[in-house]
A protein has these predicted regions:
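Cytochrome P450
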Residues: 1-320
Length: 320
């Protein structure tokens, strides 16, 4: 049986679960002839990969994703040259600093642990508890905007605008820039993993990302001069013996928070509601027992995850 599966092809995600089953049953380590990526599908094997960063590294993730499975920098093209020229002009950042910049989801231990500590400054139990009333208020506002008894588009009218509003407020971003944040986030994701993968430096993606980085650089500079009570200020705060982020690293951190707090939450809401509609007996049970909602969220993350893959680069020959 020949299984056609490419983990970086957008067409792979319309209904991946029958393919996952076939992979587990007949090809637990599967190589895509189109991209060269290997897919590991069995739980024990996935766990083995994730627990061995010395053999399976996160560091080359972005370069590999944007360059068709190759670790070297992209070949020169007009798009790439245009990007290199426009990058410092638009962002006032050094494009050649990015390959060496530390990134939370593209680093291995012990550096990864150091960067996690930076993020944890902004997600202490006290801060999370302080945000909860405002997040509940925003949920009520977005639900209140839906007209009772009339049809609505769950994703467009609720699941998209709510996470954008929440993460923008947490980051201390002006309300009038929230539409820009959604557009920027979409460009980052689409250029790296979606339809833009075939041409990741195309102007339609690059211009939006450069606009985002320029905005974040200015916002970060303001927080360094005058810290506030927002998430950006918390991440930039100097901890005793802690890590100070470079300008490039700070932009990457905030960009990651924007994307992680936006697209994933939208997908989670949509997937969870679809699963409940597909299983009306579970929907009825949750309605009868609202205390089950926290467990519902956890199960939705497992049952139809908003993020379907994690990427690693083998540092040596390995047998699973």
């Amino acid at each position: 049986m020949v299984i056609e599966f490419d983990p970086i092809a957008p067409t792979s995600w319309a209904d991946p679960y029958p393919t996952y089953r076939a992979l587990r049953d007949t090809a637990p380590v599967h190589r895509s002839p189109s991209s060269g990526f290997y897919s590991v599908s069995r739980y024990e094997d996935v766990l083995s990969v994730l627990k061995r960063p010395e053999a399976f590294s996160s560091r080359a993730m972005f370069t590999v994703l944007m360059n068709g499975g190759k670790e070297e920098l992209p070949a020169l093209s007009w798009d790439f040259v245009r990007f290199l020229v426009r990058f410092p002009l638009r962002t006032r950042l050094n494009p050649f600093a990015f390959p060496k910049a530390r990134n939370l989801i593209a680093d291995d231990p012990p550096g990864h642990g150091t960067l996690r500590n930076v993020v944890n400054r902004g997600f202490t139990p006290r801060r999370i508890a302080a945000w909860e009333p405002r997040i509940r208020e925003l949920v009520e506002q977005h639900l209140g905007a839906l007209r009772r008894g009339e049809p609505f588009d769950l994703v467009h009218d609720f699941a998209i605008p709510l996470p954008v509003t929440v993460i923008a407020e947490m980051l201390g971003i002006e309300p009038e820039r929230q539409r820009d944040f959604k557009r920027w986030s979409d460009a980052v994701i689409e250029g790296a993993t979606g339809a833009g993968r075939a041409r990741p430096f195309a102007p339609v993606y690059v211009d939006a990302v450069l606009e985002l980085m320029a905005y974040l650089r200015r916002a970060i500079a303001r927080r360094r001069r005058a810290p506030g009570d927002d998430l950006i200020s918390a991440i930039l705060a100097d901890a005793p013996g802690g890590t100070r982020l470079s300008p490039t690293e700070a932009v990457l951190f905030v960009q990651l928070l924007l994307v992680a707090g936006n697209e994933t939450t939208t997908n989670l809401i949509g997937n969870a509601v679809q699963a409940l509609l597909d299983h009306p007996e579970q929907l009825a049970r949750v309605r009868r027992e609202p205390a089950l909602v926290p467990a519902l969220v956890e199960e939705a993350l497992r049952f139809d995850a908003p993020v379907q893959t994690v990427f690693r680069t083998a540092t040596r020959d390995v047998e699973l």
